[in-house]
């Protein structure tokens, strides 16, 4: 892994907060080996807070965000999930846009 990191442009990880640190692969540790590395960390509900260490999946995000309620059955008002992984897909789109912006910034500054 370290050999790959030295030559990598981008690293994307979506472990629960603290996992990469326990593996010795924190952002700081990897940047020390490759200052140009773009380090993308995706977590379900952020790095801190009451849910930070919880496992989070698309249906959970749909429920917590109120999205399932927006799709509720009109008669029973029972929440319904969208039948696609909308939160996962949206996260991927935003992450890709962030990587593109970070690569552009790196070309100007030399740092990831």
Indicate residue ranges for each PLM-predicted region.
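A structured beta-alpha segment of the ubiquitous adenosine-cofactor-binding alpha/beta core
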Residues: 1-32
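Active-site-adjacent "lid/gating" segments in soluble enzymes
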Residues: 21-112
């Amino acid at each position: 892994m370290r050999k790959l990191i030295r030559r990598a442009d981008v690293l994307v990880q979506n472990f629960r907060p603290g996992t990469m640190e326990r593996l010795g692969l924190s952002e700081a540790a990897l940047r020390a080996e490759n200052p140009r590395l773009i380090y993308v960390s995706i977590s379900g509900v952020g790095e801190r807070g009451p849910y930070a260490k919880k496992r989070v999946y698309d249906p959970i995000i749909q429920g917590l965000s109120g999205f399932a309620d927006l799709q509720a059955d009109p008669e029973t008002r029972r929440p319904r999930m969208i039948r696609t992984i909308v939160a996962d897909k949206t996260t991927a789109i935003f992450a890709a846009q962030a990587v593109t912006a970070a690569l552009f910034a790196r070309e100007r500054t030399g740092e990831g």
